[in-house]
Amino acid sequence: MRFVLYNIRYATGTGPAFHLPVPGAGYLRSNTRVLDRITQYLKSLNPDLVGLIEIDTGSIRSGLVNQAKQIADSLGHYSTYECKYGTTSINQMVPIVRKQANAFLAAPRVEGERFHYFETGIKRLIIELELEDVAVFLVHLSLSSATATISSATCTNW
């Protein structure tokens, strides 16, 4: 099985233009060419399973395009995605932010999917994807070492 994990950073691109007109401005706009290049790159790898971190599921930033669905359709894969913040998080109310998610794309037959959430941290989402012979978990751990340690310990107890 070929598994690819890719933090696509909302297909916002990189480089000097990302920081114009102010630092970080690139997070407020997406570029369809970037998403197309990411999609072509993933196609070239011919993956069975793709974990996507930092995708946009249809905010104004992505031109209302669900990036997970668009990539999955291009690959001929099944997709499942969910907002990366807890269901009761204030982030669920904020435009653009409420469309920030993580996703799985899968070529093999999917037996089931579940969404779990850590009890602490900002990025709480855990996606569980059940395939025929294996269950795979997708987690975007915090940069905070204390939160990441707690989250990692939670994962190892499953």
Which residue stretches match the model-derived regions?
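N-terminal, active-site-proximal structural segment of metallo-dependent hydrolase catalytic domains
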Residues: 1-74, 81-89
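Short, basic/glycine-rich phosphate-binding loops at helix/coil junctions
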Residues: 11-21, 101-104, 133-137
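Short acidic/glycine-rich loop or secondary-structure boundary segments that cap or lie
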Residues: 13-14, 89, 113, 145-147
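Short secondary-structure boundary/capping elements
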Residues: 30-34, 121, 147
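A generic local structural motif
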Residues: 36-38, 91, 125, 153-155
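Structured beta-strand-rich core segments of catalytic domains in phosphoester-bond hydrolases
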Residues: 54-133
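Active-site beta-loop-alpha substructure in enzyme catalytic cores
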Residues: 134-158
